[in-house]
Amino acid sequence: MEEEFILKKYFIQYMKNIKGLSDTSVKHYIGSLRTISKFLRERNLINREVYEVIDIDMLRRLREIVYSDSDFINKNNRGKRMYSAGLNNYIAFAEGEDFKDIRDKSLLMDIPVPVKAVTGKRMISWNRSGIIRNQALEMAEYRCEVETTHESIIAERNHKLYMEGHHVIPMKKQMNFKNSLDVYANIVCLCPTCHRKIHYGVKDDRIKMGEKIYLDRADRLVNSGIRLSKREFLSIILY
């Protein structure tokens, strides 16, 4: 069985649990994106599905290509714009639209996402989704989740506080887990100071930060199929 894309799983969760759409509506959107994926595959722009794209700028460029194609325009018009509606809704999701309003509902987005088992002795590089990272920052409203009073510069890119996404359990530990670590529950929004501190600060400070994060995220990690005791958690993140 092929591994299902994490962004597809999250998009379905988002439509059902956050947007409150019916199973029928969700099925229509997924069907529209299946057609979009076929269009992109036929032009050698993706390998399998649109959900494999982990960079939001690339996703936007693909939308421009799709919407400028005369064959797609005709097909979309015949389908009463159902295909463009599916893609527009997916990109709005990928951009983190409304994510700042779902912080209290974040548990509804957390699901286990199995990763393929890796065999053999070789160097492994685990992909990190820029889309998921940015969504996590949106969910945190661009506020440091360790020290909420910490300020930062205003970023030119989005005119929001500059924050950084930190994988609490490092991606290099992925081989020790059957479920993905590149998930919302494992990404915290940190100001640059706290991000440096959790990597390079004195051990006592890092322990305090780790304890706070564990308190805030333990249940969400469990929902994502990542179950660790406090001792196990701290031993991993303090490496």
Put a short name on every predicted segment.
Residues 1-7, 157-165:
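A glycine-rich, aromatic-flanked flexible loop/lid motif
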Residues 1-25:
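Short terminal alpha-helical segments
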Residues 19-94:
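Non-catalytic DNA-binding core/recognition domains of DNA-processing enzymes
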Residues 28, 131, 163-166:
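Append "and, occasionally, other polyanion-binding protein interfaces
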Residues 97-106:
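Hydrophobic alpha-helical segments and helix pairs
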Residues 106-157, 172-182, 237:
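Short, charged surface segments at domain edges that flank catalytic/cofactor-binding sites
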Residues 160-239:
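A detector for short metal-coordination/catalytic motifs
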